[in-house]
Curated annotation (Swiss-Prot):
This protein's UniProt keywords: Pyrimidine biosynthesis, Transferase
Biological function: Catalyzes the condensation of carbamoyl phosphate and aspartate to form carbamoyl aspartate and inorganic phosphate, the committed step in the de novo pyrimidine nucleotide biosynthesis pathway.
Superkingdom assignment: Bacteria
UniProt: L-aspartate binding residues: 84, 172, 226
Alphabetized GO MF terms: amino acid binding; aspartate carbamoyltransferase activity
Binding site for carbamoyl phosphate: 56-57, 106, 139, 142, 267-268
Protein name: Aspartate carbamoyltransferase catalytic subunit
Subunit-structure text: Heterododecamer (2C3:3R2) of six catalytic PyrB chains organized as two trimers (C3), and six regulatory PyrI chains organized as three dimers (R2).
Xref: NCBIfam families: asp_carb_tr, PRK00856.1
Pathway: Pyrimidine metabolism; UMP biosynthesis via de novo pathway; (S)-dihydroorotate from bicarbonate: step 2/3
Organism expressing this protein natively: Mycobacterium sp. (strain JLS)
Entry GO CC: cytosol
């Protein structure tokens, strides 16, 4: 049966841990290699479909596939028949017919990845679909790389207190992180203005707060979210300056964190708004470590979906 990764809820604790373990193994296997190539996905075709702008996610999926010797093909809306009016369904069926083993999709519509998996389903030869971010819904591989970074920095995730700050309403990263961190045993606190919290958020497995200063001293990690102005139609807060004063991670606020705490950001960062440059570049920041881990996590995800966890992840 074709396997997909559409939401962080698809992963059990054991499955998520296995992916994180294999991500670490891939990292170690590539360490010191002059040529960063493993034969794991030789002969497989991986197609990325990005209908929204992306740097980190698109590049890391491409690098992940190439480091595993897959044939990686990039499809963008502007450079394909989508620009001529072709529907997502017809594009998906075309790529399935062309022999794709995996389709990695980023799309502005929530639920696009699920729809893609349903359209391309077949008795045989259906590609695995990986959600690389669908609207405000989810971004499961981002949650996995964040979890890997936390595990490396903190020594574990069970019982850790993770504070997620900012535009939760429009954040697929927040949704996937809440699901995965809860699965892995972390305590999650959401800090945001009331206007940037989803309806029904108090039914999530989280604590909700509007006071960032009160939450920082007990935090093991802080995940700062970008304000997604491109998804906003109205005034969700009075001004960027007021938002930064109330919810930005400034140098002064960083001093409230324990010395062992970790600062995460999925990027792109709005320096000076949700995070100061000095905090982003400080020793507590794991932003670049997240990027490195993104490649290894996506290697592990491709391996688990296309090869199977029962086979050896690393070979010469």
């Amino acid at each position: 049966m074709t396997r997909h990764l559409l939401t962080a809820a698809d992963l059990s604790r054991d499955e998520a841990t296995a992916i994180l373990d294999d991500a670490d193994r891939f990292s170690q296997a590539l360490l010191g290699r002059e040529v960063k190539k493993l034969p794991t996905l030789r002969g497989r075709t991986v197609i990325t479909m990005f209908y929204e702008n992306s740097t980190r996610t698109r590049v890391s999926f491409e690098v992940a596939g190439k480091w595993m010797s897959a044939d990686v093909i990039n499809v963008s809306a502007s450079g394909s028949s989508v620009a001529k009016g072709e529907s997502l369904r017809d594009t998906a069926l075309t790529l399935r017919a062309a022999g794709a083993d995996a389709l990695i999709i980023r799309h502005p519509a929530s639920g696009a990845a699920q729809q893609l998996a349903e359209w391309t389903a077949a008795e045989a030869g259906a590609p695995s679909v990986i959600n690389a971010g669908d609207g405000t819904h989810e971004h499961p591989t981002q949650a996995l790389l964040d979890a890997l970074t936390l595990r490396q920095r903190l020594g574990g995730i069970e019982g850790r207190r993770v504070v997620i700050v900012g535009d939760v309403l429009h954040s697929r990263v927040a949704r996937s992180n809440v699901l995965l961190l809860h699965t892995l045993g972390a305590e999650v606190v959401l800090v945001a203005p009331p206007t940037l919290l989803p309806v029904g958020v108090r039914q999530w497995p989280v604590t909700v707060s509007h006071d960032l200063d009160a939450e920082l001293p007990a935090a093991d990690a802080v995940l700062m979210l970008r304000v997604q102005a491109e998804r906003m139609n109205g005034g969700f807060f009075p001004s960027a300056r007021e938002y930064s004063v109330r919810y930005g991670l400034s140098d002064k606020r960083q001093a409230l964190l324990p010395d062992s705490a970790v600062v995460l950001h999925p990027g792109p960062m709005l320096r000076g708004m949700e995070i100061s440059s000095s905090v982003a570049d400080s020793s507590q920041s794991a932003v670049l470590q997240q990027v490195s881990n993104g490649v290894h996590v996506r290697m592990a995800v491709l391996f688990h979906l296309l090869v199977g966890a029962e086979q050896e992840a690393i070979s010469a």
